[in-house]
């Protein structure tokens, strides 16, 4: 045989040995793997169907989480919201814990949750106050009627405290919408940039006409980027003193000076006391030349 053909044959064998071979799976292994996959799918489907049936039957609810902290705080939030709504309806009398749980449909909670509500949750909640062992809603402003609302707005205006949020009034005044509508032009509404409404007392004694040119000048001045110190410095440069300089000044208490302690005369020990009548002092006589 030609030696060149033999060399080519040897090279072909080496290349064949170096290249990886891909073998086909046997039919039995493929069948077993497909059976395993089907079994897993059937098991997952059965568990999912069980969960779906539980949801459809209504067995999965908050009561299943009765031992968790989320359930406790959910009950607390529901109680506070209920006490708020009944206060806004005009039912301001306090209730016992059993009455609250009955009206909120939570009589089936455990003893630990009841103890937690009585000893910690309701007592320390800023929106709940305890009155003779009973619980009532505690609004920011406890208002009885429209007259109380008008007095509160007038007090805020006189003290320079500004207005009051409408949501705070709705929280503390029963049937607040009727009361606000009945006051009419005695109050003013101002909308904040965050779309919250603020109520102000409409002091009719302060109503006067202002020149339009002055209004334009007033609105053209922007002080958003300036703080109180910068505004005060600018006013001082213009020769304008702030209101706090013209107000009553506090009198500083007079500090009494402490008297210096009297110095005791120092006593010197004298020597040669037995020669007091014999010795003479010659310091006044000038020395002779």
UniProtKB/Swiss-Prot annotation:
What residue spans carry the region label Disordered?
17-61, 242-274
Q: Which Gene3D superfamilies match?
A: Winged helix-like DNA-binding domain superfamily/Winged helix DNA-binding domain
UniProt GO cellular component terms: transcription factor TFIIE complex
Q: Which residues form a coiled coil?
A: none
Q: Which residues carry this modification: Phosphoserine?
A: 59
Sites where N-acetylmethionine occurs are at 1
Q: Where's DNA bound on this chain?
A: 64-144
PROSITE patterns per the record?
A: TFIIE_BETA_C
Indicate, by first and last residue, each region the UniProt record lists as having compositional bias (Basic residues).
255-269
Task: Give the record's GO biological process terms.
Answer: transcription initiation at RNA polymerase II promoter
Keyword tags: Acetylation, DNA-binding, Nucleus, Phosphoprotein, Transcription, Transcription regulation
PANTHER family in UniProt: TRANSCRIPTION INITIATION FACTOR IIE SUBUNIT BETA (PTHR12716:SF8), TRANSCRIPTION INITIATION FACTOR IIE, BETA SUBUNIT (PTHR12716)
Described by its record, this protein's role is as follows: Recruits TFIIH to the initiation complex and stimulates the RNA polymerase II C-terminal domain kinase and DNA-dependent ATPase activities of TFIIH. Both TFIIH and TFIIE are required for promoter clearance by RNA polymerase.
Kindly provide the name given to this protein in its UniProt entry: General transcription factor IIE subunit 2
Organism expressing this protein natively = Bos taurus (Bovine)
